[in-house]
């Protein structure tokens, strides 16, 4: 006879069997689904996660404020004097197909000078630090960026993930994607990626073989408000010698292995448009694959980067040229040992991003102005070895030199 106690035991036994069978089936199904996911799908998922992550912003005091869940990573320009607590005005969608590429980029990635610097650190390499193939030589350098920047989002983007990330960010500008996909050399894509990611998301880009010696919170002088700076660059080369052209592309060359920027900065718009248009021109002429190593610096590297920056400094769209004493040239920066400022751009001396090179006036690694150390791994062997007034890049302004 089946007693109440036996009934309870039997029921418990049956429920246990059902639970175990269900759990086993669920695990088998999950394993089956996981095994069918391609590497591309995984990369796409990672790219989407990175692109949708909201990085915290920081100010000069080290205080950080995160984005609210409803706030987009790229905000529209607020009216002058508007409080930062207001929600950005939603932009009306419009047809951008008839706009120039520069204007399309300005529409997609509007520039807000008064916002804080995004707390992103972007690096690229063949593997992520989680991979055994990452390389022990790079681990101390990569780790230094996280150690010096607690609270920042630090991403090492692989080549495959970079493709999906660019497709996510630049879906509305197919010309840019066509140029990125068409580039025949990894170094060209690596150069292009840094400008693209900073234009779209802002933050810091630095090569994988760089060591952070000081936090980015210390890069901008205390006397300069962070809401008046949108781009921080450093001197790569200042060859004060008669034969400088035999060794370097420009008399003053700005480095692009480390750049800090707010998203949408005009310099980034111009460099992205320039590289895109030149790439597509070469592609249609059938000469894109014929790029010598010593021409990379002029195509995507520090030479064209330097040219774009000087063009910006002398552009009447952003500066009041009528009251200018003349064009800003390399002479304004040669021999500098302290930061200078042109408009919303802070220019750091050669010691800041090139300490220890033992030439061109650069200090050593322990110099107070040394911020980033570069190991020059995988670098092209050729060519890479008194503040100015603050002016808003959003409207023409004077460029008078200050002491």
Regions found by a protein language model. Name each.
Residues 191-203:
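Small-residue hinge/turn detector
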Residues 1-190, 206-403:
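Glycosyltransferase-associated regions of secretory-pathway enzymes
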């Amino acid at each position: 006879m089946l007693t109440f106690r036996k009934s309870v035991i039997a029921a418990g036994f049956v429920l246990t069997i059902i639970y175990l069978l269900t759990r086993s089936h669920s695990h088998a199904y999950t394993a089956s689904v996981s095994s069918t996911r391609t590497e591309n799908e995984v990369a796409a998922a990672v790219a989407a996660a990175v692109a949708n992550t909201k990085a915290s912003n920081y100010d000069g005091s080290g205080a950080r404020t995160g984005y609210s869940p409803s706030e987009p990573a790229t905000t529209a320009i607020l009216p002058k004097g508007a409080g930062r607590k207001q929600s950005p005005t939603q932009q009306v969608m419009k047809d951008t197909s008839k706009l120039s590429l520069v204007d399309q980029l300005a529409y997609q990635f509007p520039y807000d000078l008064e916002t804080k610097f995004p707390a992103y650190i972007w690096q690229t390499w063949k593997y992520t630090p989680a991979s055994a193939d990452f390389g022990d030589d790079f681990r101390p350098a990569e780790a230094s960026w996280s150690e010096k920047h607690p609270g920042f989002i630090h991403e090492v983007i692989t080549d495959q993930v970079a493709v999906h990330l660019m497709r996510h960010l630049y879906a509305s500008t197919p010309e840019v994607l066509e140029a990125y996909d068409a580039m025949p050399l990894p170094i060209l894509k690596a150069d292009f990626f840094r400008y693209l990611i900073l234009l779209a998301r802002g933050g810091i880009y630095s090569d994988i073989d760089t060591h952070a010696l000081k936090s980015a919170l210390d890069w901008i002088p205390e006397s300069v408000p962070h809401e008046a700076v949108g781009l921080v660059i450093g001197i790569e080369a200042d060859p004060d010698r008669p034969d400088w052209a035999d060794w370097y592309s420009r008399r003053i060359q700005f480095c692009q292995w480390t750049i800090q920027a707010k998203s949408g900065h005009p310099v980034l718009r111009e460099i992205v448009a320039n590289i895109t248009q030149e790439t597509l021109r070469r592609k249609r002429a059938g000469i894109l694959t014929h790029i010598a190593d010593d021409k990379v610096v002029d195509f995507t590297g520090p030479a064209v980067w330097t040219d774009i920056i000087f063009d910006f400094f002398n552009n009447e769209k952003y500066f009041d040229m009528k009251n200018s004493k003349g064009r800003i040239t390399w002479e304004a920066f040669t021999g500098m040992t302290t930061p200078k400022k042109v408009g919303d751009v802070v220019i750091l001396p050669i010691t800041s991003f090139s300490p220890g090179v033992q030439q061109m006036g650069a200090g050593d690694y322990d110099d107070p102005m040394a911020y980033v150390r570069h190991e020059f791994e995988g670098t092209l062997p050729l060519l890479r070895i008194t503040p100015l007034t603050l002016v808003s890049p959003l409207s023409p302004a004077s460029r008078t030199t200050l002491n």
